[in-house]
């Protein structure tokens, strides 16, 4: 049963005194929205739920009128630290080997499409956790290739290939009917 409840993380006595003064005549910035990340592991687990339970949960989370009304979703380009496995969309050297992987096709895309059917105005932001390992070097002063998921830097010799990697990824999601609002390097 999905119900809303108030959660008290501490009593008022435990909080330091705080005053927030709002002046509606002064505006410093605007809030564009709030959101959530969905990862391969998240989507895998959501797909283990009964379809009606999953749809109810996603509605409570993403619907403008029946839920929190999140306005953004962040997804990973390739694997993240919450993926089922380590991969990029181009693990074999050469950008011509680019392809969406099973985690994206089997888990992320179906959940993302279900979320967008609930709230089609959600903006999708994508960020890579890592570039393909064949694009990595130990450091920008030591261009020794580095076979690592978590360390290293992008070899300047592969800047164009990495840009193409981003473009191919956006195009692959567009081909699945998913518009990407923004990508961010990491």
Where are these regions (language model features)?
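Short, conserved phosphate-binding/catalytic loop or strand-edge motifs used
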Residues: 185-186
